[in-house]
Curated annotation (Swiss-Prot):
Function: RNA-dependent RNA polymerase which is responsible for replication and transcription of virus RNA segments. The transcription of viral mRNAs occurs by a unique mechanism called cap-snatching. 5' methylated caps of cellular mRNAs are cleaved after 10-13 nucleotides by PA. In turn, these short capped RNAs are used as primers by PB1 for transcription of viral mRNAs. During virus replication, PB1 initiates RNA synthesis and copy vRNA into complementary RNA (cRNA) which in turn serves as a template for the production of more vRNAs.
Protein's name in the database: RNA-directed RNA polymerase catalytic subunit
Cellular compartment(s): Host nucleus; Host cytoplasm
Quaternary context: Influenza RNA polymerase is composed of three subunits: PB1, PB2 and PA. Interacts (via N-terminus) with PA (via C-terminus). Interacts (via C-terminus) with PB2 (via N-terminus); this interaction is essential for transcription initiation.
Enzyme class, spelled out: transferase
Cellular component aspect of the GO annotation: host cell cytoplasm; host cell nucleus
Lineage: Viruses, Riboviria, Orthornavirae, Negarnaviricota, Polyploviricotina
Keyword Repeat recorded: no
Amino acid sequence: MDVNPTLLFLKVPAQNAISTTFPYTGDPPYSHGTGTGYTMDTVNRTHQYSERGKWTTNTETGAPQLNPIDGPLPEDNEPSGYAQTDCVLEAMAFLEESHPGIFENSCLETMEVVQQTRVDKLTQGRQTYDWTLNRNQPAATALANTIEVFRSNGLTANESGRLIDFLKDVMESMDKEEIEITTHFQRKRRVRDNMTKKMVTQRTIGKKKQRVNKRSYLIRALTLNTMTKDAERGKLKRRAIATPGMQIRGFVYFVETLARSICEKLEQSGLPVGGNEKKAKLANVVRKMMTNSQDTELSFTITGDNTKWNENQNPRMFLAMITYITKNQPEWFRNILSIAPIMFSNKMARLGKGYMFESKRMKLRTQIPAEMLASIDLKYFNESTRKKIEKIRPLLIDGTASLSPGMMMGMFNMLSTVLGVSILNLGQKKYTKTTYWWDGLQSSDDFALIVNAPNHEGIQAGVDRFYRTCKLVGINMSKKKSYINKTGTFEFTSFFYRYGFVANFSMELPSFGVSGINESADMSIGVTVIKNNMINNDLGPATAQMALQLFIKDYRYTYRCHRGDTQIQTRRSFELKKLWDQTQSKAGLLVSDGGPNLYNIRNLHIPEVCLKWELMDEDYQGRLCNPLNPFVSHKEIESVNNAVVMPAHGPAKSMEYDAVATTHSWIPKRNRSILNTSQRGILEDEQMYQKCCNLFEKFFPSSSYRRPVGISSMVEAMVSRARIDARIDFESGRIKKEEFSEIMKICSTIEELRRQK
C-alpha cells in the first residue's frame, strides 16, 4: 500500500511537524582512524582567525605563541578573535551594576567549595590525558598515576586528600628541574612453542624509570590530548575535541564552579539548568519582552548561531574576567582561579595518533606518528594534508602543536556563557540610550536575541549594535546562519518555541529501545524512558502504549525470551518452555524468563520484580533474588542506578532508574584481548588499585572515611586499623591469643616490606 507522506501532516500544525526533519533516527556517524587531520584543522583555523595578533615565544618551552588580544578592530564580517580587554572589563562592570553583589556572593560560595573539595572529585569524568604514559586513561587511573609520580618526587601535600593541596603539588612540580616517571613498555621475542613446535611472538611487559626535564614536563603538563567527536548528527565533517590532563583539570573545575555560581543567578543563562527548569527560565524572558513591547513596539527574535565560538574565545580574556570578578577577594583565591586561564594561554594540542599509510602493491601498512610530522618529506601526502602540515610546522614541538589562542571544545562552558550574557545585559534601555533595546538567552555558544523597537529601522539598528558589540569581545554572530522572526517563534538549544515550547520528540528517539546492559537494567531503563517522555515530551497515551508494546517485542527478540507458550523457536526456547510448564503462577515469571508482560502506561514507575512479586511461585522468588547465586557477580545493590541514555544531540545524559538487583543483573566480563597488549600493565595497576580500595572498604565502615587516593596511605591506614580492631577483639574475648599474635605478626611483615620497597 502506498502512503503519501504529506497526508500524515494534514491534521498536524506545522510547528509540531518540525521534529520530523531532524537527522535523529538510525545510527549516528562514528569516526574511524586518527583525529590528527581534524586537530590540525582546529589549530590552523584558530591561528587564522587571530593572524593579525602579536607573536611571542614562551621562555620556558620555546613554543611560539600568537596573542590577538587588543588586536586590530575587524573591518569586515569575517570571524575574528581580536577581543578588546577594556570592552570585556566594561561589560563585566555593567553586569555587576545590574546585579549588585553577584560576583561577591559567587566568590564566597566558590571559596567554600574550594576548601571542601576532595581530590577524588577528579576521578569523575571519562577519558583523561595521562601525562605519565602520554595517552588517554580512565580518570581514576590517570589521577592515581599522577599522585604516585608526585609522591616518588617528594610532593606529598595531596595526601591530605584536599583538591587544593593536590593543586599545590601541581604548582610545585612545575618548578622542579626534573621529574622521574615510571613508564610501561613492551618487549617482543620469538620463541618456539613446546606444544605446537611453531615459532610464536612472546610479549612481556616491563616498567622502566625515566627522567623528564623541566621543559618536557611543562609541555606534558600543558598538553591537551585530542580525539574525534563521535556520534555527531547532521554534520558532514567530523571535528576534534580535547581531553586535558590532571594538572589542568582541578584548576578548570574551580573556575567553572565560580562561573556556574554566577550563571545560576543570571536570568538569561541557559546553563547550568536543563529540561523543564530551563524551559521555564526561557519562557520568562520571552514573556518579559512581549509584555514590555507595548502595542506601539515591534518585537523580533533572532535564532542565533555563532561562528567558531571556541576558536575565537581567548584564555587571556577569561583571565581578565576572573581578575575583575575576584577583585577585593583574598590573594590565594585570586591566584588559584587565574591559573587555569594562564595554563590555557600556554596550552599545547597533542596531534593524536598520526597518519596511517598503506601500499596496495606491497600490502604494507605503516604508521607515521605525529612526532614525525615536523621532519617527514611531504611528497607522501596529498595536496590538502600537505598544506595543513606546512601551516602547522612552525608550531610543532615534540608532536604537539602550540595553541595559545582559542579554547578547546567544552572547557569553559560556564565562563563563556557569563561573557555572552554580559553582552545581552547591555541591551537595557538605560545602556542603549535610544529607542531600541534587547534581551535574550545564552547557553555556551548558542543564543537567542530578542530585539524591541518602535519600527523596523530600529530593529535593524539594534541587531547591528548587538553584532558589533559582540565583535569587541571575540564573539562572532553568523549573519548567514542566524535568522530573524516575529517574537513568539524561535529555536534555542534545540527547544522550539512557538507561543510556548513545542515538544521536539524526535530528539528522544535514539534513547528508545533496548540498551544492552543486562536483562534487569534494560527492562527498567526501557519503561523509564517511556515514562519520562510522557511526563516531559508530550508522548500521548496511545503512542506510549504502542511504544511499550514495541519495546517489549524488541526486548524479547534481543534476549530471545519469547513467552513460554509461543511457537517461536530460539536457542533459549527449550529451557524457557520447561520453566513455563513447571511454574504454577505463570503471570509471576519475568518477561526475561518467558513470562507475560504486565506493564501498561499506568504502572511504568514500578520495577518489574516488584510488580510481579506477589504473583511469583515461592521457589521462583528464592531463585530470582538470591545474592549467593554463583552465576551472578553483583554490583553493590543500590535502590537507584544511573543509566547513560543517548539523546539525539548533546552529551549522553545520565538517567535514573529503579534498580532491583536480581540474578538477571549480571555484569559482562571484560574483553580479554587487552591482556596481550602493552596496556596490560596499566590494566593490572588499575585492578590492583581497585582491589586495594575494596579491601580498604572492608576495614572501614563507609561512614568513617572518604575514598582515599593513592595506595601507600591506604596501607598505613589499614595496618593501624587492623591493630586497633585486633586489640579490641582480643580484650573483649572475641579472638584467641594465637589469632591476636598472628594478626600482629602480619601487620609487622607488611610494614617491613614497605620499608624495603
